[in-house]
Amino acid sequence: MYKNLKLNDKYVQKAINSEFKRQRNFIELIASENYVSDDVLKAQGSVLTNKYGEGYPYRRYYGSCENVDMVEQVAIDRLKEIFKVNYANVQPYSGSVANAAAIASVVPNGGKIMGLSLKSGGHLTHGYKISFSGIFYNSITYEVGKNGKLDYEEIKKIALAEKPDLIICGYSAYPRLIDFKKFREIADLCGAKLMADVAHIAGLIAGGVHPSPVGYAHVITSTTHKTFRGARGGVIMTNDEEIAKKVDRWVFPGYQGGPLFHAIAGKAIAFYEALQPSFKTYAENIVKNAKVFSEAFIKKGVEVVSGGTDNHLLLINVKSSYNITGKEAENFLEKINITINKNSIPFDELPPLVTSGIRLGTAAMTSRNFTKWEELAEIIDYSLRNLEFLNSKSKAARDKVKELKNRVLSFNKEFPILKKY
């Protein structure tokens, strides 16, 4: 499936094949992206996309569901095995839907939820005012400390003062380990439920390189792509039977109708891959590579938020390090075939579409067995330090940009996208 497609619809064919070319020729550093196996792609393009079946395995509202029942049940069983949980729902179309259903399962209408602010690395669905979580619930936030790390004492003070119904931990731009035990202690002190959104770190947990929230969080949500390297979608897990029943009702019929069986098949295959011994090595390499990458920038005097990383991502303050914006960094690096994303950083004074920071992740390129992290850091650092020159129209600048791009292209030839894991 990692090949050019031939379709009757030439417009869509061109877009898909152009995207395949882009993925093949670009260094992918967006922390939420990865390369799935050929098997996952095949499953998602299978005849399962034709089948409808509301409800859950072996209790559907439609007939002839025996084959999709098998697929969904094996996905459930594998996810339960990976995370060592008693209950799993693999139907959510996305992480956001999973969060919506999970929150509704443990928080009353209009109840109070408490999550990390966007600038500190939280997610829209953790209480941001324009998200469902900030519209239908009374949301409050906590922040990271001046050092860029979670301040558990400050979080406890806020929780005791505000008495939320739910505390959310697990983030989209936080580079350090999360102490789920401390969060549960805080939740118990203020009478709150604890939800862990492990969308970014699920693969690291599966590989044993990040602590698990199981045994601490009342309910756990995740996506199945990112470090999990599977089909795009969401899942919800818990060990609480009553919460499990509510989750099932909120997923269907609460938020969704028929499941996307082709996507669930892609999830099932990714879970199979995550159960193989090689996945542990993959997870270990993600973190090892992120630490090497981070240290390479630190050695060059670059401000890495929190002073480093414990997981798959790092945040760089490009405003203080290079006197540029995240938007400017993202736009230029794309010219030399490096994909990153601008990202707000703690205490950011710039708007979200501009930002003072960038976010870099190692999950995707680790899937390609990429090893030139220090050299890549050198290219990025040089580019951002010399942005004014490189964006000029001089022949010297054009030649240098071409040279940088060719170096990146050589990386992509040396480390191609793999089809099997």
UniProtKB/Swiss-Prot annotation:
The record marks H225 as: Plays an important role in substrate specificity. Its EC number is 2.1.2.1. It is found in: Cytoplasm. The keyword Cytoplasm applies. Keywords: Amino-acid biosynthesis, Cytoplasm, One-carbon metabolism, Pyridoxal phosphate, Transferase. GO terms for biological process: glycine biosynthetic process from serine; tetrahydrofolate interconversion. It is an enzyme of class 2 (transferase). SUPFAM superfamilies: PLP-dependent transferases. Its cofactor is pyridoxal 5'-phosphate. (6S)-5,6,7,8-tetrahydrofolate binds at L118, G122, H123, L124, E242. GO terms for molecular function: glycine hydroxymethyltransferase activity; pyridoxal phosphate binding. The modification N6-(pyridoxal phosphate)lysine is found at K226. One of its GO terms (cellular component) is cytosol. Pathway: One-carbon metabolism; tetrahydrofolate interconversion; Amino-acid biosynthesis; glycine biosynthesis; glycine from L-serine: step 1/1. Belongs to the SHMT family. Catalyzes the reversible interconversion of serine and glycine with tetrahydrofolate (THF) serving as the one-carbon carrier. This reaction serves as the major source of one-carbon groups required for the biosynthesis of purines, thymidylate, methionine, and other important biomolecules. Also exhibits THF-independent aldolase activity toward beta-hydroxyamino acids, producing glycine and aldehydes, via a retro-aldol mechanism. This is Serine hydroxymethyltransferase. It comes from Mycoplasmopsis synoviae (strain 53) (Mycoplasma synoviae). The gene is glyA.
